[in-house]
Amino acid sequence: RVRSSAASDVYKRQDLGTSGNKATLFDESGLLIASRTAAYPTDYASGNRAEQNPHDWWKAIVDTTQALLELVSPADIAGVALSGQMMGCLCVDKNGRPLRPHMLYCDQRSQKEETILSEKIDPLHFYEITGHRISASYSIEKLMWVKKHEPEIFAQTAKMLNAKDYI
């Protein structure tokens, strides 16, 4: 073990990125103690799609956490921070279970929904409300795509989450 309970506090960080999860340990001064990474696949199917399996994220979190806990005692960890990829679309049911693969920010199949949204609301007004432009990269357009193309999934959707929110 690299730390003991007599050592200064240790902080654990998980970054659920596009290509993998990076878990790190820092001391209270910000010095990096250790880092572990676990990759997961992205399915780049035809039609501008980019999807991931949320179960792969969870496995990566578990694997990297277990690897770091071989180096420090859980009692030494004073705090945990989680960051992750954004602008995706993960539809979950009322029990929090994924209903379909997660659509990543780079999934562009909702370009028609982007156009529809632009016709229904002034893009400047949309920006004033949300702080974002209308784009197939964002979550709302992806959810609109699910509603149109996978109505049975949309009907079961209790929440739409981003990757880190699911974890």
Language model: regions and residue ranges:
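N-terminal phosphate-binding loop and adjacent alpha-helix
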Residues: 36-74, 118
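Glycine-rich phosphate-binding/catalytic subdomain of phosphoryl-transfer
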Residues: 62-167
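Ser/Thr-centric signal marking residues that sit
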Residues: 4, 18-19, 130
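Short glycine-rich, Thr/Ser-proximal phosphate-binding strand/loop in the N-terminal lobe
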Residues: 16-54, 97-105
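A short acidic Gly-Thr/Ser loop motif
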Residues: 15-19, 82-85
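Single conserved hydrophobic/aromatic residue that forms the stacking wall/gate
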Residues: 1-7, 11
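Hydrophobic packing within well-folded, soluble alpha/beta domains
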Residues: 10, 23-25, 61
